[in-house]
């Protein structure tokens, strides 16, 4: 079995302004990727789902070598943790149906989960961890969305390389 794909995802939401941000970092076979985004007139739940959907969006189908391993998802989001039973059942013979709301965000999650085992765990936010890095980017994304509206951007590889607990594998020159 291939090594697991690890995902750290966080969401930040400001209820007074109705704006939110999300960030996710993914480690798959030593390759790190990260993205952040945000929008106005949203909910905390949509931001949590958007972060997970973004982390899963460009994975190859479950039968491909990089993607055949399980997906371990770590989050601090209570909104995403509410869906733990649904997410943990994806890819299993007795799969739970996703909620009927936010289907635009559930679609990429369901597509990416085909043929894979997902495990979602809510963890505490501790300084100097990949989760703290992801939470900081989610807060930055929330503030940027409040000021400028909807956006999505990649987290620079240079920033990912500095995260304690993550190792960035540099591709050899072709």
Predicted regions and their residues:
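RNase H-like nuclease fold core
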Residues: 1-46, 57-58, 64, 167-174
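Low-complexity, flexible helical/coil segments
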Residues: 41-46, 60-63, 107-111, 155-161
């Amino acid at each position: 079995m291939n090594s697991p794909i690890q995902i750290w995802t966080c969401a930040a939401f400001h209820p007074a302004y109705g704006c939110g941000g999300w960030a996710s970092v993914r480690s798959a076979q030593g390759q790190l990727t990260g993205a952040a985004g945000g929008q106005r007139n949203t909910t905390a739940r949509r931001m949590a789902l958007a972060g997970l959907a973004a982390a899963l969006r460009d994975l190859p189908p479950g039968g491909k070598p990089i993607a055949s391993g399980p997906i371990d998802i770590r989050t601090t989001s209570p909104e995403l943790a509410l869906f733990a039973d649904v997410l943990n059942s994806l890819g299993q013979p007795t799969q739970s149906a996703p909620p009927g709301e936010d289907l635009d965000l559930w679609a990429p999650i369901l597509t990416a989960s085909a043929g894979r085992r997902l495990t979602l765990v809510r963890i505490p936010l501790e300084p100097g961890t990949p989760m703290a890095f992801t939470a900081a980017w989610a807060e930055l994304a929330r503030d940027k969305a409040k000021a400028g509206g909807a956006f999505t951007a990649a987290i620079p590889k240079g920033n990912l390389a500095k995260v304690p607990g993550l190792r960035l594998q540099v591709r050899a020159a072709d």
